[in-house]
Amino acid sequence: MDLLNAFKALANPARLKILSGLKDPERSFPAQDEGDVKVDGVCVSSIQEGMGLSQSTTSQYMSVLSRAGLVVATRRGKWTYYKRNEVAIRQLAAAIGTDL
């Protein structure tokens, strides 16, 4: 895990809120028409609506979180769904405990 990229991704309050929201997506984001949020993840449009962000800003934020390895993207047709990468988040927490 690249700690610097992870910290940069989490330094933005909206990205941090998105990652926190993905921990309990059913409570944090509006219901979506397709897919199970626990299995498939949360659609970008639901994240956008739940956060009150533009589509382009939401896509950019999710790209940053994805490059940092904190979320996993799954493409289904024209939709992209995101879930937390729990393994990477645990590695980040462990690294904070040992490296800082």
Predicted regions and their residues:
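Short, Lys/Arg-enriched N-terminal segment that forms or immediately precedes the first helix
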Residues: M1-F7
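N-terminal helix-turn-helix DNA-binding core of bacterial DNA-binding proteins
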Residues: K8, A14-S54, T80-V87
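Alpha-helical residues within the helix-turn-helix
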Residues: E49, Q60, S66-R67
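Base-recognition residues in the alpha-helical recognition helix of bacterial helix-turn-helix
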Residues: S59-Y61, K78
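Beta-hairpin "wing" of winged helix-turn-helix
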Residues: R67-R76, K83
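Short, charged/polar, Gly/Pro-enriched secondary-structure boundary elements
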Residues: A88-L92
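Residue-level signal for well-ordered alpha-helical positions
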Residues: A95-I96
